[in-house]
């Protein structure tokens, strides 16, 4: 687990320091794909560079698996960084070396014997789908292939954590999808914890199971994707799964329904109609695949039965069956 406690980072700038991060606190669960989303200038890249002390924070604590990074000696920090791989937007490949050597260079630096190094590079090339490009040079690769080399290189020392700093922002949508699918596979196969910086909500939708929203150096909200989507006040949840748009004025009670994964709303609504004699009119909505699960959001009108409508019972009936219902 990565635990960040009251992390701040300021830069000297004339009379007043520039505040890049202010009192940031986060818990990143082991094995998760954690997205940190925000606009340009929000402090995302500064935060991720603090996680392996490429940027040293001005104050605060960073614990990785219980070890406080800011108190480590230079030697201890070098060893700790072997457990934290990192990929970047601009790949940072050595253009004078082929794919094989770009992956092997980090293993050479840490002194891995040649036979082990060769075996490890071959494993990584197979993992990222580049076995046929082992002796190609960066100039001969597409953007997606270059990023796959970057991923292989980041995984060379078998880290437990992978930091991704806008790693797909320079790629086209199709290539982005393939890189995200690869990262998702790596997360599942290796149990790797991935911390992913992005300004694109589609990236969070595609791969993340936890997320945080960063604005002007502060964490505005954070949580599991399912919890954010279930929270009617969550800005991130609303952005990931927008509402159905403006609706006409209605004289009947109206609700927003949110449901998850394999749960289908229609059988629940049918049961509601049968047990409570409530007519349900579907106004709009949709289903998307977010955070590895199907999520649906519907707007409905409840038509009053002859005997009247007990809204509290109706909402409780839906919530008891896993459909979050809120009057709108």
UniProtKB/Swiss-Prot annotation:
The keyword Cell inner membrane applies. Coiled coil: none annotated. The keyword Translocase applies. It is an enzyme of class 7 (translocase). It catalyses: L-methionine(out) + ATP + H2O = L-methionine(in) + ADP + phosphate + H(+); D-methionine(out) + ATP + H2O = D-methionine(in) + ADP + phosphate + H(+). It is a peripheral membrane protein. ATP binds at residues 38-45. The gene is metN2. Part of the ABC transporter complex MetNIQ involved in methionine import. Responsible for energy coupling to the transport system. GO terms for molecular function: ABC-type D-methionine transporter activity; ATP binding; ATP hydrolysis activity. Keywords: Amino-acid transport, ATP-binding, Cell inner membrane, Cell membrane, Membrane, Nucleotide-binding, Translocase, Transport. It holds the Pfam family ABC_tran. This is Methionine import ATP-binding protein MetN 2. Residues 2-241 form the ABC transporter domain. Its main location: membrane. One of its GO terms (cellular component) is plasma membrane. It comes from the Bacteria. InterPro entries: AAA+_ATPase (IPR003593), ABC_transporter-like_ATP-bd (IPR003439), ABC_transporter-like_CS (IPR017871), ACT-like_dom_sf (IPR045865), MetN_ABC (IPR041701), MetN_ABC_transporter-like (IPR050086), NIL_domain (IPR018449), P-loop_NTPase (IPR027417). Belongs to the ABC transporter superfamily. Methionine importer (TC 3.A.1.24) family. It is found in: Cell inner membrane. Its EC number is 7.4.2.11. The lineage of its organism: Bacteria, Pseudomonadati, Pseudomonadota, Gammaproteobacteria, Enterobacterales. The complex is composed of two ATP-binding proteins (MetN), two transmembrane proteins (MetI) and a solute-binding protein (MetQ).
């Amino acid at each position: 687990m990565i635990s960040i406690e009251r992390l701040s980072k300021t830069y000297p700038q004339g009379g007043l320091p520039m505040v890049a991060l202010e009192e940031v606190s986060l818990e990143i669960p082991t094995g998760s794909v954690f997205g940190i989303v925000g606009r340009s200038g929000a402090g995302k890249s500064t935060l991720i560079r603090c996680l392996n002390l490429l940027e040293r924070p001005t104050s605060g604590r960073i614990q990785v698996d219980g070890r406080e990074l800011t108190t480590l000696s230079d030697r201890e920090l070098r060893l700790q960084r072997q457990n934290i791989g990192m990929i970047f937007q601009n790949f940072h490949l050595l253009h004078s070396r082929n794919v094989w050597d770009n992956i092997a260079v980090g293993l050479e630096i840490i002194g891995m014997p040649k036979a082990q190094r060769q075996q490890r590079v071959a494993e990584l090339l197979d993992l990222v789908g580049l076995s046929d490009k082992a002796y190609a040079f960066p100039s001969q690769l597409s953007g997606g292939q270059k990023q796959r080399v970057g991923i292989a290189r980041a995984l060379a020392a078998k880290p437990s954590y992978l930091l991704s700093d806008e790693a797909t922002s320079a790629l086209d949508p199709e290539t982005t999808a393939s890189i995200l699918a690869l990262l998702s596979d790596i997360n599942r196969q290796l149990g790797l914890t991935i911390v992913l910086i992005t300004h694109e909500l589609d990236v969070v939708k595609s791969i993340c199971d936890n997320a945080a929203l960063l604005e002007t150096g502060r964490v505005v909200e954070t949580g599991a994707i399912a919890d954010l989507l279930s929270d009617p006040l969550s800005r991130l949840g609303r952005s990931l799964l927008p509402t159905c748009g403006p609706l006409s004025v209605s004289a009947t009670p109206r609700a927003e329904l949110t449901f998850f994964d394999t749960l289908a709303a229609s059988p629940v609504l049918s049961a509601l109609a049968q047990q409570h004699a409530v007519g349900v009119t579907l106004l709009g909505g949709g289903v998307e695949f977010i955070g590895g699960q199907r999520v649906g959001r519907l707007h409905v009108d409840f038509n009053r039965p002859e005997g009247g409508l007990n809204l509290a019972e109706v909402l409780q009936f839906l919530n008891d069956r896993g459909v979050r219902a809120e009057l709108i």
